[in-house]
């Protein structure tokens, strides 16, 4: 099974080698058919502490690194 890749915005970089990435998804409400926005925050591994708050990044699923970290940052978007 391929690893999932998500895009999101860095909302916190205060932890060492960790960033918190907010990923937004949009979907049609099943009854109202209105577009609804939902977001979720993922902790991702940032080995060199190079990503800052506001950066748009891609994160990829990986083996568990800690209790909460199961994602790693692979690239920043231009």
From Swiss-Prot:
Name of the gene: rpsQ
Q: Which HAMAP family match?
A: Ribosomal_uS17_B
Output this protein's name.
Small ribosomal subunit protein uS17
Molecular function (GO) terms for this protein are: rRNA binding; structural constituent of ribosome
Does Repressor appear among the keywords?
Answer: no
Per the record, the GO terms for biological process are: translation
A Pfam family per the record: Ribosomal_S17
Explain the purpose of this protein. One of the primary rRNA binding proteins, it binds specifically to the 5'-end of 16S ribosomal RNA.
Database matches in PANTHER family: 40S RIBOSOMAL PROTEIN S11 FAMILY MEMBER, SMALL RIBOSOMAL SUBUNIT PROTEIN US17M
Query: Which region is the signal sequence?
Result: none
The subunit structure is: Part of the 30S ribosomal subunit.
The record's family statement is: Belongs to the universal ribosomal protein uS17 family.
GO cellular component terms?
cytosolic small ribosomal subunit
């Amino acid at each position: 099974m391929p690893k999932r890749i998500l895009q999101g915005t860095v909302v916190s970089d205060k932890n060492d080698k960790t960033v918190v990435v907010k990923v937004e998804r949009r979907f049609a409400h099943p009854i109202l058919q209105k577009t609804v926005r939902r977001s979720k925050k993922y902790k991702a591994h940032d080995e060199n502490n190079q990503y800052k708050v506001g950066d748009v990044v891609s994160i990829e699923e990986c083996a568990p690194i800690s209790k909460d970290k199961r994602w790693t940052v692979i690239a920043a978007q231009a």
